[in-house]
Amino acid sequence: MKPGIHPEYRPVLFHDTSADVYFLIGSTAETDKTHTHTDGKTYPYVTLDVSSASHPVYTGEQRKTKSEGRVAGFNKRFAGFVGGKGA
């Protein structure tokens, strides 16, 4: 490999702010911020909005959306037609 053209690979502390979870991962991410981790060492610090700790696909939690409300309204309106009064 040519010297001086590759980014520095080092441990970086990522913080998922929505779940308040920290991940210490090897990365080449550039940042000017630093933060002291629970091990007492100071690492480069990057904040995240979403990670595997907070994303609904990984947590199993579903967030209610407008379309889910419309489906629930449809099911409520037509619930009597399926195996209901006329059968």
Curated annotation (Swiss-Prot):
Subunit structure, interactors included: Part of the 50S ribosomal subunit.
Protein known as: Large ribosomal subunit protein bL31B
Name of the gene this protein is made from: rpmE2
Species name: Pseudomonas aeruginosa (strain ATCC 15692 / DSM 22644 / CIP 104116 / JCM 14847 / LMG 12228 / 1C / PRS 101 / PAO1)
Biological process terms in GO annotation: translation
GO cellular component, one term: ribosome
The family this protein is said to belong to: Belongs to the bacterial ribosomal protein bL31 family. Type B subfamily.
Keywords tagged on the record: Ribonucleoprotein, Ribosomal protein
Pfam families, sorted: Ribosomal_L31 (PF01197)
GO MF annotation list: structural constituent of ribosome
UniProt-listed NCBIfam families: L31, PRK01678.1
HAMAP family the record matches: Ribosomal_bL31_2
Ranges annotated as spanning the membrane: none
Keyword Oxidoreductase attributed: no
